[in-house]
Amino acid sequence: MVFRSPLELYPTHFFLPNFAADPHHRSLLLASGGSGSGSGCSPGAGGGGGSSRAPHEELSMFQLPTLNFSPEQVASVCETLEETGDIERLGRFLWSLPVAPGACEAINKHESILRARAVVAFHTGNFRDLYHILENHKFTKESHGKLQAMWLEAHYQEAEKLRGRPLGPVDKYRVRKKFPLPRTIWDGEQKTHCFKERTRSLLREWYLQDPYPNPSKKRELAQATGLTPTQVGNWFKNRRQRDRAAAAKNRLQHQAIGQSGMRSLAEPGCPTHSSAESPSTAASPTTSVSSLTERAETGTSILSVTSSDSECDV
């Protein structure tokens, strides 16, 4: 015995869902049924002058079978089609949705059906409908990840179309700031890209040994930290960039301090020490420059550490 679902028994219902409801089609159906006068095929034409059937009775003879689905059945079909990725079929199913009388309100509130409509709107480029669905219906946390990704990607695509070029990381950051996630698909928790202290400590240890790890070392470190190789590579890349920037800043500060110290000592009539200073504390030009340089190195070394480690690693 071959089992067939109700959808397979009456496929024509999906192609003509509103055929009988259209006034033009209704008149065609009534006309094709005849009025019963002068036609031996009419069921009311027997015995002379029989009464013709009422219009709704004539119409019922030509109507296609009506299928009634509960919201749970519709949601089950939507979930299956969404999981399989058959977006085109999912869209056709939602467009020609046969529902039981009085079930429209429940259909419009069911999360699986609303999520399916959002998926179809996203894949068809109908971003206005997508935003309307996501902003006006509260979704559970299980659906947040997928819906957040669609929200952001839709805004990215609109921004790319408007600017006529692909978006970079900074552009995407600005888009996210301009179009924050609605609270209907977001629990309010701020996402952090900072790693745990244990992970950061392990990454720093490996960085001191080798700032340029090869792919095999990245995979090994990823397993040790629970990160992905891409995250490990990004952390090393960002750390190298911060260290280079800190080193360049240190060099500039050294040069500026050295030049200012030499200019102050070279000025005529400039005392090498104040009258309040004792001879033992009076410093020669060489001593003054060296002390200034030493103080600069101390300050900049602190700056280098804070600039490298105070930021979040992504």
From Swiss-Prot:
Keywords: Developmental protein, DNA-binding, Homeobox, Nucleus, Repressor, Transcription, Transcription regulation. Residues 298-314 have a biased composition (Polar residues). GO terms for biological process: apoptotic process involved in development; brain development; cell proliferation in forebrain; epithelial cell maturation; eye development; forebrain dorsal/ventral pattern formation; lens development in camera-type eye; lens fiber cell apoptotic process. GO terms for molecular function: DNA binding; DNA-binding transcription activator activity, RNA polymerase II-specific; DNA-binding transcription factor activity, RNA polymerase II-specific; RNA polymerase II cis-regulatory region sequence-specific DNA binding. The keyword RNA-binding does not apply. Residues 214-233, 240-314 are annotated as: Disordered. It is found in: Nucleus. Gene3D superfamilies: Homeodomain-like (1.10.10.60). The keyword Repressor applies. It holds the Pfam family Homeodomain. SMART domains: HOX (SM00389). Residues 188-247 bind DNA. Belongs to the SIX/Sine oculis homeobox family. Transcriptional regulator which can act as both a transcriptional repressor and activator by binding a ATTA homeodomain core recognition sequence on these target genes. During forebrain development represses WNT1 expression allowing zona limitans intrathalamica formation and thereby ensuring proper anterio-posterior patterning of the diencephalon and formation of the rostral diencephalon. Acts as a direct upstream activator of SHH expression in the rostral diencephalon ventral midline and that in turn SHH maintains its expression. This is Homeobox protein SIX3. It comes from Gallus gallus (Chicken).
